[in-house]
């Protein structure tokens, strides 16, 4: 299974990741998108977290979820799908994590000048 498109991860943002598959996604019965960094599974998104459109699976991350990633070390991402009894995995993708100058949700830090 080949994943064609992937966006980057920046901490405290709300990215949407797109996975283009070589088949229609309608038949997918199980799905896990695993985000792995520094020898730990950081986040798993499931089928209920995703949107399907023809051959594309998309998943959005929240500010809280991207805050879980460390600014040091790439994140590895793998898509695993099940269609009935069949199981498939994508290649492991590596994306760079971009840091922020000030930690915190935007709504918490945008109230004026920070000390």
PLM-predicted stretches and their roles:
Residues 1-115:
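Contiguous segments within soluble domain cores/interaction surfaces
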């Amino acid at each position: 299974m080949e994943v064609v498109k992937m966006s980057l991860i920046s901490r405290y943002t709300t990215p949407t990741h797109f996975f283009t598959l070589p088949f229609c996604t309608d038949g997918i019965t199980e799905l896990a998108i695993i985000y792995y960094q520094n020898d730990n599974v950081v986040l798993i998104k499931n089928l209920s977290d995703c949107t399907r459109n023809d051959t594309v699976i998309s998943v959005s991350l929240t500010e809280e979820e991207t805050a879980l990633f460390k600014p040091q070390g790439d994140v590895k991402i793998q898509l695993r799908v099940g269609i009935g009894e069949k199981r498939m995995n994508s290649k492991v993708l590596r994306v760079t994590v971009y840091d922020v100058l000030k930690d915190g949700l935007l709504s918490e830090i945008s109230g004026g000048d920070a000390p």
